[in-house]
Every structure is written in structure tokens, then in C-alpha cells.
């Protein structure tokens, strides 16, 4: 089956061909015809299976018949994913003079407001920043959203979590009634919150649902491995894995749970002559864009990232994912390892497991449906003799440099302004007593 068979116009087939996309994936075969028939859609598929094309292609096909106003809105949880989706829309619509607006935090709101007033054809946004515009930027900025034909929630399982819901509701309340627009939800993990939406049928009847079987949560081309080790030697083993002859030319993403760890590992690996970039919330937006650009261009072989990079980012060259820290949620593990073994390619994941992680490993294996294999490429004696001291020295210097630079100060200031300050210096101080009868407002 070809994209022509799915009913896409010739100009769009040419754009797909120029992007080296010639055969539709399972989710594209299932969803594109149904969306073009006007149905709402819930699309669940493994990461790397082409979900973005599954909603972008039919939207663009319909837009080309009447290219005016803000035709479609795509909501997504992270800036990086928003940028990637916008790039795909721009590439697909390059021959049709498409106008795509990117709306996310960390850049000037006035500039974004002016861009929205020009009525771009498609808006790719994070809910928080779009909600800010709805609340404060005025009617000229937001009026185009009152007539959108499509709204997409990409990584819908994440958008429907409590942290996003208030801003998401603000965005959705501005849009036309569901009976007057198409609503498309796409995700790699179809949660109960996503699945519950199928019962809200309304006038249009039930949505079309394409859902993967739960027993194939990760690609069959992915090899999942683990290394059981003491926590204090993880850095040495990480360096040993990355520089092993079998891996020294592979591109890799290292996932961690904290921004502090991400920056520490980046500096440590750079000191050990491993070209490394990092991606975490402590970085300014342009720094994040530059880091991703370096990694995509292979100027950096390794990317150290928090879960900001675990969802949706399509970097085809990633051959290995290393979980330096295991995530608490098994679905987050699925999203992480899904950065490799994409679109039928082979890939490998290695999880560094300490004694505290055993329960997490068990939960992950139950969710994924397969056991991790022991990673036996690294010799313990060699790590102790050759890697432990240099890695420890490089890590110690990285920590000292970060302390001297007040790393994390910007975030602490932001949290303080938001009333969420956690003063690291006062963590060990006893709380002040409050006089009887006085309130203790935070």
C-alpha cells in the first residue's frame, strides 16, 4: 500500500518522497483514511512508528483545499517536541507556502503574539505558553483559534496528567465546540485517562481508535540489557560502556532523573574526551536548541538528558540508550528506550541497576513483557584498574566547577518567585516556631 492509496494528494506524496518516506506505517494506514473521513481519532502506537505523519498528512491534505486562518492546533508537552513537529509540518508543506507558528516558553511573548495575529496556518504549542497568551495577550492574538478545524494532543497521556490539565482546559475552552472540529489524540502509551475519552461520543459518534497490543510495548529490534553495580561506580562503568570498541562510534542518549546529574555527567565526559551535549530544564531555550542541533549533526556523539528528551524526539541515528538512573514509572522507561530502534532499525538499551532499583526493574519487566539480559561486555577488573580513578577525578572537578558557577541558581530564583523555593542551604535547619495565633502562610 502507498500513500496515494490512502487518499493523499499528489503534492503531499511528493513531499513525503522527498523526506524518504515512501511506505506508510501501520498507524498511518489505520488513521489517515479515518481522519480524512472526518472522524475524531485516538491513535496509540510504539514510539518511532510515524505518529506525527499520521496526523499531519491528513490535516495538510484538507488544509490545501482551503488554506486560510489558523487551520489546526497541535498541543504537545515539551518545547523540543514542539520544534520537531513544526519542522515536519514545514517540510511537508514546503511547496505550498505553509506558515507554521511555534508557541512555547523561554522566548519573547510579544514576538509570539505578533506572529499569531498574522494567522499562521498551523500552530504548534505547549499548553502553558498558549494558556499565557489566552489570559494576557488580547483578542487580536487569540481570535484565530475560535475557528480551528483540527486540534491535536500529541503525547496525550502526558497532557492529561494533573500538572497540565489547568492550562490544557484554558486552551480547549477557547476552541470551537467539539462537534465543529476534529479532535486527534496520539500517544505511545494509551492510559486509562486517554481511553476514557472514547466514551464521550457527542453528536459525531465514537472516535476511531487504533491501539497497539500491550505485549509489544517496545520494538522487537531493541535489545534490553542491565548492569548490576554499586551506585558509587556508575560513572566509571558509564565511561567504560561508551568507550568500549563495540560502542565507541555509536551515538547514545544517557537518561538521568535530575538536571544536576545531567550537567555533571556532561562535564565529566567532556573532560574524558567524549564529545557530549546535554538537555535539561536548567538550560535556556536557545542552549537546548543548540544542544539538540549538535547531537543531530553528530558534532556530539552523546546526549545526556532528563526526561525532557524521552518523548517523541525523532533522532534516527541513536543506536544506544543508557539509563544512568532508572525512572520510577515503567511507561517512562518505554519512552526512553524508544529513542533507539526506531522505524525498524536495531538498537540497544543498557540500564545501570543499583540495589535500590530492583523493584523498578521488576515493574519495568512486567510492563514490557520481557526480561532484560545481563550486559556482559564490560570487565569489572578493567573498570577498577583503568576507569575508576579518572572518572572519579573528572566528576569531582565537574561538581566543584558547578558549585563555583552557582549552577541551578536560576531555577532556585524562579521557584522562589513562584513560592516554591527550596533553599538548599536551609535544608538542615529546624523550622522556625510560629507564635500562637499567627498564621503560617506559604
Swiss-Prot record:
Keywords on record: ATP-binding, Helicase, Hydrolase, Nucleotide-binding, Nucleus, Ribosome biogenesis, RNA-binding, rRNA processing
Disordered: annotated span: 411-442
Chain positions of motif Q motif: 1-29
CDD domains in the record: DEADc_DDX49 (cd17955), SF2_C_DEAD (cd18787)
Residues in Helicase C-terminal domain copies: 237-383
Binding-site residues, ATP: 45-52
GO CC, alphabetical: nucleolus; nucleus
Xref: Pfam families: DEAD, Helicase_C
Gene3D superfamilies (UniProt xref): P-loop containing nucleotide triphosphate hydrolases
Domain Helicase ATP-binding: 32-208
Positions occupied by motif DEAD box: 154-157
Annotated EC: 3.6.4.13
A GO biological-process term: rRNA processing
GO function terms (MF aspect): ATP binding; ATP hydrolysis activity; RNA binding; RNA helicase activity
The reaction(s) this protein catalyses: ATP + H2O = ADP + phosphate + H(+)
UniProt similarity note: Belongs to the DEAD box helicase family. DDX49/DBP8 subfamily.
Domain-related comment: The Q motif is unique to and characteristic of the DEAD box family of RNA helicases and controls ATP binding and hydrolysis.
Function: ATP-binding RNA helicase involved in 40S ribosomal subunit biogenesis and is required for the normal formation of 18S rRNAs through pre-rRNA processing at A0, A1 and A2 sites. Required for vegetative growth.
Protein name in UniProt: ATP-dependent RNA helicase DBP8
Species in which this protein is naturally found: Yarrowia lipolytica (strain CLIB 122 / E 150)
